[in-house]
């Protein structure tokens, strides 16, 4: 299991939202490329990037910042937010993004996931965001009647590289991830699961490591590494040695 720092982009800056609300944002850095370099220096093996404006608009919005990040670092990246079609996926992969995350598009159009996996094997990740176990889309603005587990099962056999599971109620709230829900999802599918939402201490990372065998491949952390609640270098060292 690896620790994956997040860069959430809004109007070209690194921000963090509380529970996905655009009006509840905190700007942590004006230069995303500098921030990416800092996470790389601290031992990050993968960088998670979200185009927040893109997620709400349904089309890419922070391309210049994304390009600057990719050029600034040598470690691989995964990107989500507003990616709804094959040409957009192709454009981002051509830019140097390692893996593309499909969220709203995956829920609304599973055939897109299947086609993307066929065209770009190993480079498509599905993001499943849930509130009380139900899938939320459109930048979390809309909760559907589909459960996270049912949606995840739909992608078995497609060749999806990973599923990022975010518990919206925990995101940006520094309350710890939803271990039970994350484990239940991981055990229900064969696709590796990356936990997201609420990872806010080394203890949270240790707790996720206890369920690593169920299929947990990583933990995304955002606010905690910006505020210093998690020292990224320490978190990376913890996962490398397999626990405390």
From Swiss-Prot:
Descriptive protein name: 1-(5-phosphoribosyl)-5-[(5-phosphoribosylamino)methylideneamino] imidazole-4-carboxamide isomerase
Pfam families (UniProt xref): His_biosynth
Disulfide bonds: none
GO MF annotations in UniProt: 1-(5-phosphoribosyl)-5-[(5-phosphoribosylamino)methylideneamino]imidazole-4-carboxamide isomerase activity
Keyword field: Amino-acid biosynthesis, Cytoplasm, Histidine biosynthesis, Isomerase
Family in the record: Belongs to the HisA/HisF family.
Catalytic reactions of this protein: 1-(5-phospho-beta-D-ribosyl)-5-[(5-phospho-beta-D-ribosylamino)methylideneamino]imidazole-4-carboxamide = 5-[(5-phospho-1-deoxy-D-ribulos-1-ylimino)methylamino]-1-(5-phospho-beta-D-ribosyl)imidazole-4-carboxamide
UniProt xrefs under SUPFAM superfamilies: Ribulose-phoshate binding barrel
Family matches, as InterPro entries: Aldolase_TIM, His_biosynth, HisA_bact_arch, Isoase_HisA-like, Isoase_HisA-like_bact, RibuloseP-bd_barrel
EC number: 5.3.1.16
Compartments it resides in: Cytoplasm
Record: active site: 8, 129
Pathway annotation: Amino-acid biosynthesis; L-histidine biosynthesis; L-histidine from 5-phospho-alpha-D-ribose 1-diphosphate: step 4/9
Enzyme class: isomerase
Gene behind this protein: hisA
Single GO cellular component term: cytoplasm
GO BP annotations, alphabetical order: L-histidine biosynthetic process; L-tryptophan biosynthetic process
Organism of this sequence: Geobacter metallireducens (strain ATCC 53774 / DSM 7210 / GS-15)
Taxon lineage: Bacteria, Pseudomonadati, Thermodesulfobacteriota, Desulfuromonadia, Geobacterales
